[in-house]
């Protein structure tokens, strides 16, 4: 397996969206506009795809458990929808454990560490050990440990006291342009407190002095019960549109987090599990499904509680050409 933790060099590149494409405003965000934005980002997303020749459609995840020895589980849209638990998920995961299936939560949420994510899921009634959760925050930490940029590194999005890169000076940024100018690279973990001031300072700083930008979370939105939260990739798309160099992405669908997940699956199961027996269960074609297809594991699209709830899923698949191995409604 290739080692995606190590990148021999970093090259700053620009990208121009098609002149006819306009990034949707936040008030106009819906499933279709999210797919359109992802599609316009496809040139710098993983490009290899071993599309399924036969997509299996089933009502529930529990109906297809016998196809897997390990399952990677997205959080939003699979385990929870905002602060609400996805109905039936606890019983299905209990059945999976009874069958000896190794479970691993793989989330693009990078604002918090795995301890906090474990506690958040536990509050909903879902019990995972800390080792059964991998976030793109962790992927960023490991990738940057192997590939240290010239310091200091400016951190945006809840650095806390636990985001540590050995032998690299990490500085939690504030809304002060002069501080941005003092760092040699940036990592964007989350955008919970993001606003136009943050956006303008980062954009102006990177245009004035191009430097590396690492983005831990490639999600455009996250599904909640009745709306979507706006996630880092949406704001980064505006940076790209304004002439900032392309960032280096570290979450799904990009391979670093999947390699980290494969290593963790081996540790948890105590054995080598063939890629054909590992499934990624997610709600989004361009992150969960594209990432799984590109990495060579099986992809499972859950449609009822995430991005595509109340949407014509077949239309979205035809539009994108991203074909899951399995399509299910819920757990």
Question: Where on the chain are the PLM-derived regions?
Answer:
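Short glycine-rich or small-residue beta-strand-to-loop segments that form or flank ligand, phosphate
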Residues: 102-106
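Asp-based, Mg2+/Mn2+-dependent phosphohydrolase catalytic module
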Residues: 2-101, 112-134, 141-331
């Amino acid at each position: 397996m290739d080692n995606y933790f190590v990148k021999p060099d970093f090259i700053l590149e620009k990208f121009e969206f098609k002149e006819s494409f306009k990034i949707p405003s936040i008030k106009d965000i819906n499933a279709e506009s999210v797919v359109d934005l992802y599609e316009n980002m496809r040139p710098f997303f993983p490009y290899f795809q071993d599309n399924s020749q036969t997509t299996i459609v089933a009502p529930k995840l529990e109906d297809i458990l016998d196809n897997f020895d390990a399952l990677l589980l997205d959080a939003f849209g699979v385990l929870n929808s905002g602060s609400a638990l996805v109905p039936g998920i606890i019983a299905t995961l209990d059945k999976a454990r009874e069958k000896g299936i190794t479970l691993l939560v793989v989330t693009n949420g990078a604002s918090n560490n795995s301890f906090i994510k474990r506690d958040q899921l536990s509050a909903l009634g879902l019990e995972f050990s800390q080792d059964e959760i991998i976030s793109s925050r962790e992927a960023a930490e490991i990738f940057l440990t192997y590939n240290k940029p010239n310091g200091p590194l400016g951190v945006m999005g809840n650095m806390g006291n636990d985001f540590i890169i050995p032998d690299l000076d990490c500085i939690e940024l504030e809304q002060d342009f002069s501080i941005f100018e003092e760092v040699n690279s940036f990592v964007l973990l989350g955008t919970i407190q993001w606003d136009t001031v943050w956006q303008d300072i980062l954009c102006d700083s990177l245009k004035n002095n191009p430097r590396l930008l690492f983005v831990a979370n490639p999600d455009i939105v996250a599904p909640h019960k009745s709306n979507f939260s706006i996630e880092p990739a949406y704001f980064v798309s505006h940076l790209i549109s304004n002439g900032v160099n392309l960032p280096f992405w570290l979450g799904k669908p990009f391979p670093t987090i999947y390699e980290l997940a494969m290593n963790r699956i081996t540790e948890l199961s105590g054995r080598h599990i063939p890629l054909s027996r590992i499934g990624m269960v997610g709600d989004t074609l361009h992150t969960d499904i594209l990432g799984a297809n590109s990495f060579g594991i099986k992809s499972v699209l859950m449609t009822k509680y995430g991005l595509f709830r109340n949407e014509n899923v077949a239309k979205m698949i035809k539009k994108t050409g991203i074909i899951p191995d399995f399509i299910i409604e819920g757990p």
